[in-house]
Curated annotation (Swiss-Prot):
One GO-annotated biological process of the protein: NADP biosynthetic process
Gene coding for it: nadK
GO MF, any single term: NAD+ kinase activity
Keywords tagged on the record: ATP-binding, Cytoplasm, Kinase, NAD, NADP, Nucleotide-binding, Transferase
Main localization, broad class: cytoplasm
Name assigned to this protein: NAD kinase
Species of origin: Teredinibacter turnerae (strain ATCC 39867 / T7901)
Source lineage: Bacteria, Pseudomonadati, Pseudomonadota, Gammaproteobacteria, Cellvibrionales
Amino acid sequence: MQSFNTIGLIGRLASASTQYSLKRLIAFLTDQKLEVLLDKETSTILPDCDLPVATRPELAQACDLIIVVGGDGSLLSAARAFAGHDVQILGINRGRLGFLTDISPEDIENKVGEVLSGRYLLEQRFLLESTLLRDDEVMSTGLALNDVVIHPGKLIRMIEFELYIDDEFVYRQRSDGLIISSPTGSTAYALSGGGPIMHPNLDAVVLVPLYPHTLSSRPIVVGGNSEIRLIVCENNNLNPLVTCDGQSQTMTQPGDTVFITKSEKRLKLIHPEGHNFYETCRSKLGWASHTGN
């Protein structure tokens, strides 16, 4: 396993618990005589810290390990910044569910120490890439580790769009939107929308309709290399939004085309040794664990 020499730290902002965990982590890493860099935004919640400060592009170039202290949202933001770079990501959970940030705050020294000694599992997660075209001109692009969603925004009104997969017409739909999710995102918003749980190793994408105005529209699982194309219908009375991971969004206009494909970029995600996807599902989703009669 790769050894780590330069470690970047990113923390969830406006969180006292994150501050506490970051201070513990910094003390532990400096005791190990490792070079530690602090994310520029994160430095605002640690004003007394004397670590070198770096922007995320600078962290991507200088570090071989990024440790994110926060929730899944913090890790999603880091994923888009560091995917495609030769840097690995480790998460410490200071959020709510913590599907991606799977080290407990109580185990920081123990579990991070195991990772530093080479005892960890490495996964390569693919991201989705969205491209918005208007009159054959690229208006915006976006990356998502979890999902790309087309939706009406703040207004409680249905939108209408056409769906094509690999240039084949699938349907024209009126609904509250559509979730296009990676396997990583299948335990997030897509799950709430009634989509299936997909193992992270699957090379697949799931499309989950949001409250479709039909009784027969169900989630569709397609191959990971599929090209998904959405056409915003002309008769929409609003401007649907396209959102990546619930964190970045762009506004569409009637007649726009949105392409969603698998990105060439990969996220190198680290888990502690012994990590088990199904155990994570049991603990995070409240599945029964009793196997006796």
